[in-house]
Amino acid sequence: IGPAGENLALMAAVMNDKHRAAARSGVGAVMGSKNLKAVVAQGKKNPTLADTEGMRKLSVTISKEVGVDVKKGSSLREYGTAYVPQVTNTLGILPTRNFQTGTFEGTDQIDGVALKEKYLIRHTPCYRCPISCGRLTAVDDEEYAGKGEGPEYESIASLGSACGVDHLGALTKANYWCNELGMDTISTGMTIAAAMEMYEKGYIPEEDIGQPLRFGDADAMIEMIQKMAYRDGFGDSLAEGSYRLAAKYGHPEIAVTARKQEFPGYDPRGSQGMGLLYATSNKGASHMEGDLAYSEVFGVPEKIDPLTSEGKAPLVARFEDAFALIDAAGLCVFLAVRYVFDEDVNLWPTRLTQLMNLTTGAEYTPAEIMQAAERIYNLERLFLIGAGSGKNDDTLPYRMLHEPLPDGPGKGKVVELDKMLPEFYADRGWDQDGVP
């Protein structure tokens, strides 16, 4: 962990491989609270496999299957996740100025094309990955000079459009700082965005902050990141996250959170399934608990209408179970979703079952694997309920339920959570109070 974790900032991440982050839910602060700086694993032995030759053959098959998609022309390969701002902006769901709108006029200046033209050094793939979505970048602008990885889409949305910042060099520098300090870029950027809105509306006095904090002020944003990590001055309030910050100043409606965690980069008013996902995610607002954007936004395996709430409950449950399995197996989402949403619905459990059996020597069936996914999600849910977070927290912030989107294809829409939530409980076999 970095200084943010040491100072128990609630958006502190656990960093690994220099630029990779276990970022959400304040896990860095948990380590910091235990005076645990790092966990180190050392060893020279290779992992043992139950069937080495079988695994080799299956790996070749999987590489070819994934490679077919890559060869067709993958934006993920060419631009990394930085290609996504253009997609979400077109759909009107790009978080802009703390989710006050869903379109950002500066998108062209901070997207993957701009990043590739200005700052890209090379791709940084994980070992033998055919997708190669990682990016090593360097900013040569004197004011924001630096070198590192990223920014990824979520960082662009939270540190860029959500804060009204359209300077790619400043945004990239902010991303570097978050990595150096050990911070979740999503909660960091979204918390600053909430503070910017409250400052502009006169809810936070300038003397509390020590300086102006307006949307679009990249230098102020970067300074706030450093203050958050060290709990310096106003940074002490920011380090508590937007939910507590907004409550402190008497305007809880400004915070855009679920289970007190800041939203990622998809405005659910224009992506209804994402709204249900945020409300029911076991770790608070998260796109990594079952990203329905794959279908609503990217059309995988087929495009579904993001503006309707009809039929979204069973889809969200399916996505949540699939992502639980991906995490449990230690797989990359970008590789795994190629199977989760294949036209052949049996391909996903079949491939994962093969991987599990060749690794462990077990004889799982696809049905058993899928049942395990449901058990994982239900067990997490029971843990939450035991901690006092059940149906009462299966909700969304005021803005999502009562303030219609002002622009984009979803103009006039709010999240229809009251329609989707009972259907979701029923689909999962939970009672009307959301208890498995």
Features from the language model and the residues they span:
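Extended C-terminal regions of large enzymes
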Residues: 2-25, 31-436
